[in-house]
From Swiss-Prot:
The lineage of its organism: Bacteria, Bacillati, Bacillota, Bacillota incertae sedis, Caldicellulosiruptorales. It holds the Pfam family Cpn60_TCP1. SUPFAM superfamilies: GroEL apical domain-like (SSF52029), GroEL equatorial domain-like (SSF48592), GroEL-intermediate domain like (SSF54849). Transmembrane segments: none annotated. This is Chaperonin GroEL. One of its GO terms (cellular component) is cytoplasm. Belongs to the chaperonin (HSP60) family. Its EC number is 5.6.1.7. Disulfide bonds: none annotated. GO terms for biological process: protein refolding. The keyword DNA damage does not apply. Signal peptide: none annotated. One of its GO terms (molecular function) is unfolded protein binding. The gene is groEL. It comes from Caldicellulosiruptor saccharolyticus (strain ATCC 43494 / DSM 8903 / Tp8T 6331).
Amino acid sequence: MAAKMILFDEEARRALERGVNKLADTVKVTLGPKGRNVVLEKKFGSPQIVNDGVTIAKEIELEDPFENMGAQIVREVASKTNDIAGDGTTTATVLAQAMIREGLKNIAAGANPMILRRGIQKAVDVVVDEIKKMSKKVRGKEDITYVASISAGDEEIGKLVADAMEKVTNDGVITVEESKTTETTLEIVEGMQFDRGYISAYMVTDTERMEAVLDDPYILITDKKISTIQDILPLLEQIVQQGKKLLIIAEDVEGEALATLVVNKLRGTLQCVAVKAPGFGDRRKAMLQDIAILTGGQVISEELGLDLREVKISQLGRARQVKVQKENTIIVDGAGDPSEIKARIQSIKKQIEETTSDFDREKLQERLAKLAGGVAVIHVGAATETEMKEKKLRIEDALAATKAAVEEGIVPGGGTAFINAIPALDKLIETLTGDEKTGAMIVKKALEEPLRQIAENAGLDGSVIVNKVKESPAGIGFDALNERFVDMFEAGIVDPTKVTRTAIQNAASAAAMLLTTEAVVAEKPEKEKNPPAPAPDMY
């Protein structure tokens, strides 16, 4: 086991604080409408220019192991806030730094860390309650535009995100992809889309666009491989008699079966398109079941004791239209029973709540969106790749912020909500004594910090701005972009309640952990051994 280095009390806390400050000072320059960018070196490719707190925090590793621990504690604040609320990471970092700074001053002056921690917790509970009381419900597209614009620092992005949210509703999924052009555009996909295209190009109905469009088709859904035409011949005969079209979704269609379908299509006997089933393994079964419920059909599977040769037309799904492209299939207006679709949506929502894996959650959200609201794709365009990546991060933040706003509502932005919570905190402080009171005072001081930082990033004196907002009526804050004092709700400067609440809770949690630290243990770096001397030349 490697030897360890240990630091105690004041020395340990100071080392942690240096790390906290190095990370927080790097992150906080990005706060507010006049916040600057940070350039991150990349091992491969061009450097990344970002304005996103958590992305910067994740890149920071310090050489000194003790300082690095302090930095990692605050990094945890940023990433936890990002996981829960998706935005507000810089605010959380600024709050944590302020609480740690004030707390360490008081501990150095003789305060008891454990009692300070109790005071901090009581104060945060009061602040969170106050933030919830201030919260207003999101009303309509305009509020969403405000939230997205503030989060991304760009009105165009705000409008785009609001359009996307309006089209796909809360259960829909909005994905962000890189565009081939310099334009940033929004594409709405109606109905259920999955990433599998036609098995054979001979199946297309529109040769110019290279896509197959089937109006009012039957849909055969199976998890089997179809190799011989005998398997589906009885079914095909019934469909030809009715003069209908057919979409086959199967594990694969190959050999003689595929050849027969293509020949019949070319002769005009039967218009049929075959696509492979989406997903893999258990996820494929679930997705096929989703398609079956959406179209009112049944998954023909041996597990259910169903045989392809005995399939009746009543077991097939129906849809108003199916569009099959080279790599995508879109089912529009499935004929499924609305109550069954609703039940399926509820079941997926429950799975989303219970899953612990981020990957599974993302896939479940996609399935939910396809069943419920549809899918919107924002194609991000920019002149250079560096700018595109930066823009993509900002759009992702804006999306997370709008979802958080729809969930829990909005509060005045620009650090105003924290300042407006101070009077409620003052009432609590009057009831506390000793170090508990000091703990609550630490939180009170920290609440001013986001606004002070926004003002300083705009090149103004933070303390003057903070005092002016404190003296103003509730809801009046500082518009740093236009350098004026306004009613934040009216000016459209708002933050999601969830983001504001999460930022203060996570910051306090990390600060409390760090302030109650008495010893720090790190691994001693091994000294590099000198290489052996080269052997003398032999003659």
